[in-house]
Amino acid sequence: QATRAELWSWRKTPEGRLAEIIVLDQFSRNIYRDQPESFAYDGLALALSQEAISLQLDAQLNPEQRSFLYMPFMHSESKLIHEFALKLFQRLGNEINLSFEKKHKVIIDRFGRYPHRNAILGRVSTPEETEFLLEPNSSF
């Protein structure tokens, strides 16, 4: 239902909206691990997160909840989105989450995408990406 945007009634509360985002952003990554579908709902999760922030619903959530609300920004392959993500995680004040965002942003700034997704998504890796993927901690 979430993948078809049928859970709009959940969006009546900040917690309900967060639940829908978690289903789209987190559940899909685990249910469809190593399959293209694991990233298929990233755009919808990001749009819902952006809208929640625009409506200032994040202010009604506790810091742990906000970290999950902001996760779709970290999963994006957009440099522009990562600029905003960095600000979100800095404002959140959790050093662990901020550290992870910085690591994600470095990869996006360098490649414009996450090379570890290439094989799953049927994308051809560049020689630089292939070399990067041989390094420790090159994927999440």
Task: Describe the residue ranges of each PLM region.
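Intrinsically disordered, low-complexity activation-like regions
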Residues: 1-34, 39-140
